[in-house]
Regions:
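Alpha-helical interface subdomain recognition
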Residues: 1-2, 9, 25-30, 37, ...
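Active-site nucleophile and cofactor-binding loops and adjacent substrate-binding regions
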Residues: 8-15
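Helix-loop "lid/cap" segments that line or gate small-molecule binding pockets
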Residues: 16-25
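A short, Trp-centered hydrophobic/proline-enriched beta-strand micro-motif
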Residues: 41-49, 93
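Active-site-adjacent elements of ketosynthase-type condensing enzymes
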Residues: 53-61, 122
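Short Gly/Pro-enriched turn/cap motifs at secondary-structure boundaries
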Residues: 53-56, 80-83, 99-101, 134-141
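A short core secondary-structure module
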Residues: 73-127
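Flexible, small-/acidic-enriched active-site or ligand-binding loops
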Residues: 118-149
């Protein structure tokens, strides 16, 4: 997909991370309720982690979910959330115990929909903020999500049914995200190679296609090598992830190399 439209793969990635959280960590009842809606496209969304004052420092988030009987009341703001405008549901990292030490022990993951999946009625307390403009990568929207006393029942919306596990769920989602970003890098690098090779056959100098000049052949060879190496790193990371093993190192290596390959081949 990324060979033709990288932003579209980004839309899928955010939705896949949402689905992964429920598939991997949700209760059986949550899986039965949410996953068919995610798979059919009835609902799509993403992973809401980042806040105005907490990016890479996930333990610094301020969005809270306070228990009130059988419900939670969510208050806070998320920002730079992919699919924030067009999406309708988000796996959202919150603090259920703001006083926990270390902070990660007080963090939980909740499924927060903009509207009731059954009636379609908007949820009071969930508001989409402004669309955030980017320099590029405009095919996927980014936005603020604002929670102002959003009330939802615990059984359906607290992932896994237990507090304090959200940090580990978020990290698991990021592993999948890194592999997806790496795959996107492969797509861009591969398309760059195809376009370069096609141009090398078409453009002529000194009476022959430039692809017959050794200097161009060396450049194309380097591009092809980067593509193949990136493919292997992505496949390795994906296999490790699919086996249920820890894949953060392999995913990080694949993301780094494939994104560099995309930049170098495109340049």
């Amino acid at each position: 997909i990324s060979e033709h439209w990288m932003s579209l793969a980004g839309i899928f990635n955010s939705h896949l991370m949402l689905a992964m959280v429920v598939e991997k960590f949700g209760t059986e009842a949550q899986k039965d309720y949410w996953l068919p809606r995610f798979a059919s496209g009835e609902m799509r969304g993403g992973l809401a982690l980042t806040e105005p004052d907490a990016g890479t420092d996930l333990q610094g988030i301020r969005t809270t979910a306070q228990r009130d009987g059988d419900d939670y009341v969510v208050t806070g703001t998320k920002t730079w959330i992919s699919n924030g405008i067009e999406g309708s549901v988000f796996a959202t990292l919150v603090k259920t115990d703001p006083q926990a030490d270390p902070p990660r022990r007080g963090m939980s993951m909740m499924i927060l929909p903009k509207h009731d999946p059954e009636t379609g009625a908007p949820h009071p307390g969930f508001r989409t903020g402004k669309r955030l403009e980017k320099l590029g990568y405009k095919g996927i929207d980014s936005a603020e999500l604002i929670f102002d006393g959003l009330r939802l029942d615990a059984a359906r919306h607290l992932v896994g049914g237990a507090e304090g596990e959200g940090f580990y769920m978020a990290v698991g989602g990021l592993e999948l995200g890194r592999i997806n970003v790496a795959a996107r890098g492969v797509g861009v690098a591969r398309r760059s190679l195809y376009e370069a090779a096609a141009y090398a056959r078409e453009r002529k100098t000194f009476g022959k296609p430039i692809g017959e000049h050794q200097a161009i052949q060396l450049k194309l060879g380097e591009m092809a090598t980067r593509v193949r190496a990136a493919e292997l790193l992505v496949e390795d990371a994906a296999r490790i992830y699919d086996r249920g093993e820890r894949s953060d190192q392999a995913a990080g290596m694949a993301k780094y190399f494939a994104s560099e390959a995309a930049m170098e081949n495109a340049a």
